[in-house]
Amino acid sequence: MERRRGTVPLGWVFFVLCLSASSSCAVDLGSKSSNSTCRLNVTELASIHPGETWTLHGMCISICYYENVTEDEIIGVAFTWQHNESVVDLWLYQNDTVIRNFSDITTNILQDGLKMRTVPVTKLYTSRMVTNLTVGRYDCLRCENGTTKIIERLYVRLGSLYPRPPGSGLAKHPSVSADEELSATLARDIVLVSAITLFFFLLALRIPQRLCQRLRIRLPHRYQRLRTED
């Protein structure tokens, strides 16, 4: 089905408005069947860097590993939007059952991506197309006895809009500044584009073909001249 350009899904608009209307930046992770309720604080999440991976574009795949998951424990993925950190979406499981799904499910490829194995290891797969609505921070979390723990973190960004936090997975050498790194990347791209352009320009002038033909003609004559001199 073809979507109109420039349109925004109504579900996403309502989701943003509802979150903007709330004064607190905390989200309840508990369910009616759970004995305790965990709260997810966005400000606290921003200061946690347990382990990070960066993805630029295409498809982002987040794999969360959990050990010794109990039936009462809640596991899932918390998504924080790149353009507004007060916008938080959750994908939660409890006892192999979805108790909360992402609001923007059109870009959630593996909606039922929970893969259970024998204890003690549990895997949770999240796969989404990288768009303007899905860029941001993905935190693998688990809620147990009223405590929220962040297991793994994935940053998804378009271009260089999302700032690199200190100690990120793509940390550069301390002796290299940001300006030097940007200049080196720009110079490398310019050299690469120039080399490709020159190659196709010479190819259009048939210079490589002519050079190969001249070598094929001259090499036998030189070999015959050497044999005559011997």
From Swiss-Prot:
Family membership, please give it. Belongs to the HHV-5 UL16 protein family.
Query: What is one GO cellular-component annotation here?
Result: membrane
Q: What does the UniProt keyword field contain?
A: Glycoprotein, Host membrane, Host-virus interaction, Membrane, Modulation of host NK-cell activity by virus, Signal, Transmembrane, Transmembrane helix, Viral immunoevasion
**Transmembrane parts of this sequence:** 185-205
Keyword Glycoprotein attributed:
yes
Where is this protein localized, as stated in its record? Answer: Host membrane
Membrane-topology annotation of the record:
Single-pass membrane protein
Xref: Pfam families: UL16
State the function annotated in the UniProt record. Answer: Plays a role in escape from host immune response. Blocks the interaction between the host KLRK1 receptor with the ligands ULBP1 and ULBP2. ULBPs activate multiple signaling pathways in primary NK cells, resulting in the production of cytokines and chemokines. The sequestration of diverse KLRK1 ligands in the endoplasmic reticulum and cis-Golgi apparatus of cells by UL16 inhibits the activation of NK cells.
State the organism named in the record: Human cytomegalovirus (strain AD169) (HHV-5)
Q: Where does it primarily localize?
A: host cell
Q: Which gene encodes it?
A: UL16
Would you tell me the protein name for this molecule? Answer: Protein UL16
Signal peptide position in this chain? Answer: 1-26
Extract one GO BP annotation from the record: symbiont-mediated perturbation of host natural killer cell mediated immune response
Q: Which cysteines are joined by disulfide bonds?
A: none
Q: How does it assemble?
A: Interacts with host ULBP1, ULBP2 and MICB.
